[in-house]
Regions:
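Cysteine-dependent hydrolase recognition
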Residues: 14, 21-388, 396-397
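Bacterial N-terminal signal peptides that target proteins for export
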Residues: 1-9
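Short, intrinsically disordered, low-complexity terminal segments
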Residues: 7-8, 14-18, 436
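Compositionally biased, intrinsically disordered/low-complexity regions enriched for serine, proline
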Residues: 3, 13, 383, 463, ...
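Long, compositionally biased non-active-site segments enriched in small/hydrophobic residues and glycine
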Residues: 386, 390, 401-406
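Extended, beta-strand-rich, solvent-exposed assembly scaffolds of outer structural proteins
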Residues: 402-486
């Protein structure tokens, strides 16, 4: 049996113990429907709770009662006004998330989720394909990336932000979602991620992935946060941090369950995102918002039971690592074209942001000419020294202060038994490239007996014969040796 060995580079590179959420309030554009009083009120409330300036508020005008919008109207009345606002307000390059507030259509042409169409373009049904199929060219390149999201990275050959519908059955509930999203940040709440199942064979298709998710939690020492049950959905024994199951309707035992601020919850069924229309009596994303979730996902039309059209249960692990709800949900769905992401994308209960203090100039000081800045930065007690620093002035991105590049020439080494594998960091490589390089070195020299895969900021190593001739486990170690430019 193979033994999985995790190369623990945490203390040897500058790998955070928990990933940092990729966006903050100044990376969000709030979009309101000028034809809806509730939408305008919710947008103003979101700005207030997250401390956003007015330049981050964009108005569009669509029928507030429409459930769907034509592709032509979507381009003219939704996408183009958003792009124009970003350009006119000098926000280009810094908007990584969109929050569309209440009373906007949930779908485009009745068969694409509005957020998906904004994220990576409208995906028409494949010609001559059966009703149950996955549309061609609908793979989300951000899926499973485990990287902080920036729109300018060019995911899916676009520069599009991750869009969320901030929606609920009424304005009051929607405001409560905002409250929970704002309250969740960096709280590290106690509770459980619940990966549950059911006897519904058509919908209970994700349980096979639960052991792989549990393994990742174990490798990071987070097993206490995870509850799994492949065949039923019991009442969660602790506050819900995340919830996954496969049922058309939410279990009645959730009626009095506790949801931690920031909780992501969803269920695999036909049309949980077909709001405001009812769908075969099934529960919807609105039901999750009412119960206490902060983010969710649902499909806007019949997707059939394709697992790739729904969140991968690894979403629990990614959220626990510190990604925000927007990133965790967006990287969890391989083919999201028929779905909508719902709630507050900024919710990030496991983010570990650094403390940043501006030492000079003094607050409210009058400045004239060039002024040096004095900034002190300290790592979060659960995080690591920061590697990304950006300067914003008046709500707009002004300049990057620091970027994470691995020291050129440093040699990353993994030792498995008597086998030594090394990779020398090249110029302009970051941590992720360095991890990929080490994995390449292991695969090139392991003769198929020792293999490795790079997963964002870490490397996982598998050994076919994990014991030596003496029957004992092979010794394993990793190190960084300073190179010519250390």
């Amino acid at each position: 049996m193979n033994r999985l060995l995790r190369s623990c580079l945490a203390a040897l590179l500058f790998l955070p113990a928990l990933a940092q959420a990729g966006g903050g309030p100044l990376n969000v554009l709030v979009v309101v429907n000028s034809a809806s009083r509730d939408s305008r009120a919710l947008g103003a409330y979101y700005l207030e709770k997250h401390g956003l300036p007015q330049s981050h508020l964009c108005s569009i005008k669509v029928d507030p009662r429409a459930a769907s919008i034509s592709l032509a109207d979507f381009e003219r009345d939704v996408r183009l006004p958003i792009l124009a606002h970003v350009a006119n307000q000098g926000l280009a390059g810094q908007i990584h998330f969109l929050v569309l507030c209440l009373d906007v259509p949930s779908r485009v042409e009745g068969n694409n989720g509005l957020t998906a169409a904004l994220f990576y373009g409208y995906k028409p049904p494949t010609p001559n394909a059966p009703q149950c199929h996955v549309a061609s060219n609908s793979v989300n390149q951000y899926f499973g990336s485990e990287l902080a999201y920036t729109a300018t990275a060019g995911w899916n050959r676009t520069n599009a932000p991750i869009p969320f519908l901030l929606t609920a059955a009424n304005l009051e509930t929607a405001k409560q979602v905002v409250d929970r999203g704002a309250a969740a940040f960096a709280t590290f709440p106690a509770g459980a991620f619940c990966l549950y199942g059911s006897a519904d064979d058509a919908r209970n298709i994700r349980y096979r992935t639960y052991p792989a998710v549990a393994r990742q939690f174990a490798l990071f020492g987070l097993s206490a946060l995870l509850e799994t049950n492949a065949v039923s959905s019991p009442r969660p024994p602790r506050p819900i941090l995340g919830y996954v199951n496969g049922l058309p309707n939410l279990p009645t035992n959730l009626a009095d369950a506790a949801f931690a601020p920031g909780a992501i919850a969803e269920h695999l069924t036909s049309c949980a995102g077909m709001i405001p229309d009812p769908c075969l009596g099934q529960s919807s994303v609105w039901d999750w918002m009412r119960l206490g979730a902060t983010a969710s996902y649902g499909t806007v039309c019949e997707p059939c039971a394709f697992q790739e059209k729904f969140p991968d249960p690894m979403i629990a692990f990614w959220y626990a690592r510190g990604f925000c709800a927007g990133e965790a949900l967006a990287m969890s769905v391989r083919n999201p074209y028929q779905g909508i992401w719902v709630g507050d994308p900024l919710a990030a209960p496991f983010a570990a942001p650094p403390s940043v203090v501006l030492r000079a100039p003094a607050r409210n000081a009058e400045l004239d000419g060039e002024t040096p800045l004095q900034i002190s930065v300290a790592a979060h007690e659960r995080g690591a020294p920061p590697v990304y620093l950006d300067l914003y002035l008046d709500g707009r991105h002004h300049a990057p202060i620091a970027r994470p590049f691995a020291p050129v020439g440093n040699e990353l080494v993994a030792q498995v038994g008597t086998n030594r594998f090394a990779y020398v960091v090249a110029p302009a490589e970051d941590l992720y490239a360095a991890a990929a390089g080490l994995a390449w070195a292991i695969n090139a020299g392991g003769a198929g007996q020792i293999t490795a895969s790079a997963k964002a900021d870490r490397v996982e190593i598998a050994v076919r014969q994990p014991r030596g001739a003496d029957g004992l486990p092979l010794p394993f170690a990793v190190s960084v040796e300073k190179g010519f430019a250390a």
